[in-house]
Amino acid sequence: MTQIIDGKALAQKMQSQLAKKVEDLKQEFGIVPGLVVILVGDNPASQVYVRNKERSAIAAGFKSETIRLSESICQEELIKIIHRYNKDESIHGILVQLPLPTHINEKRIILEIDPHKDVDGFHPMNTGHLWSGRPIMVPCTPAGIMEMLSEYQIDLEGKHAVIIGRSNIVGKPMAQLLLDKNATVTLTHSRTRNLSKISSEADVLIVAIGQGHFVTEEYVKEGAVVIDVGMNRDDNGKLIGDVAFEEVSRKASYITPVPGGVGPMTITMLLEQTYQSALRRVSS
């Protein structure tokens, strides 16, 4: 029987535990973890994500600040704002919501964030730590997936893990985290030949390709663990994943739903990394 990996329930559990840790930090050291989210423009999806992050941060006892900027802001002005929060000792996490308007260079903006406050884990210094096997700040979605696999006691050692999607946000860091757990990893993408054949050999299949219901049952072997990272809208505006849930769930041993799977855990790991950043500040 297929087991649903309930990311929403796990996120609630972890955020409840996090709220207690935040209160303990406040009582013992007088420090409240501070998170600032910088939103440029009025992308509707980004606005929803930012609201959810802000709500979760406040509920867990964080200091939460959202900076909403005009889409027309120039790159240098945005960098000045980032530098201000780099120096602000009450802020332990800085997140610039992506995507940014086309006139702003995302790579340059990521470089300007203090890597010790880069709770998205995108700064090259944090990428280097991850690839050298000494992760500090890890991209939140892969980190959340690893927590889910651990919670459901899914053993990765010696397993064949296939990732569909090679982004710097999910696919590439996910590959390294799985390698660190001694999985054998195949990283694929939209131009991979014989993709359905490769994915159907996976013990663990992680799908982050950004196409609604891309993965159907022929992509999945019997008993596989299927993690769906996708968030898409169908023709009726319904939120769907990259995996055709109904048909794939008939073959999978474990599967994440959309919504209620990976999404809530991404926010949870953002908060966890902000807390850890505050804790490192105390230690130093």
Curated annotation (Swiss-Prot):
Recorded hits in PROSITE patterns, A to Z, give: THF_DHG_CYH_1, THF_DHG_CYH_2
The pathway it acts in is: One-carbon metabolism; tetrahydrofolate interconversion
UniProt keyword annotation of Amino-acid biosynthesis present = yes
Q: Which UniProt keywords apply?
A: Amino-acid biosynthesis, Histidine biosynthesis, Hydrolase, Methionine biosynthesis, Multifunctional enzyme, NADP, One-carbon metabolism, Oxidoreductase, Purine biosynthesis
Q: Which InterPro entries does UniProt cross-reference here?
A: Aminoacid_DH-like_N_sf, NAD(P)-bd_dom_sf, THF_DH/CycHdrlase, THF_DH/CycHdrlase_cat_dom, THF_DH/CycHdrlase_CS, THF_DH/CycHdrlase_NAD-bd_dom
Q: Which GO terms describe its biological process?
A: L-histidine biosynthetic process; methionine biosynthetic process; purine nucleotide biosynthetic process; tetrahydrofolate interconversion
The record's EC number reads 1.5.1.5, 3.5.4.9
- Tell me which positions the record assigns to the signal sequence: none
Q: Provide the catalytic activity annotation.
A: (6R)-5,10-methylene-5,6,7,8-tetrahydrofolate + NADP(+) = (6R)-5,10-methenyltetrahydrofolate + NADPH; (6R)-5,10-methenyltetrahydrofolate + H2O = (6R)-10-formyltetrahydrofolate + H(+)
Residue sites binding NADP(+) per the record: G165, R166, S167, S190
Q: Which CDD domains match?
A: NAD_bind_m-THF_DH_Cyclohyd
Task: Choose one Gene Ontology CC annotation of this protein and give it.
Answer: cytosol
Can you state the subunit structure given in the record? Homodimer.
Note the NCBIfam families from the entry.
PRK10792.1 (NF008058), PRK14179.1 (NF010776), PRK14186.1 (NF010783)
Q: What does this protein do?
A: Catalyzes the oxidation of 5,10-methylenetetrahydrofolate to 5,10-methenyltetrahydrofolate and then the hydrolysis of 5,10-methenyltetrahydrofolate to 10-formyltetrahydrofolate.
Q: Which family does it belong to?
A: Belongs to the tetrahydrofolate dehydrogenase/cyclohydrolase family.
Q: What is this protein called?
A: Bifunctional protein FolD
Species of the source: Streptococcus uberis (strain ATCC BAA-854 / 0140J)
Gene that this polypeptide is encoded by: folD
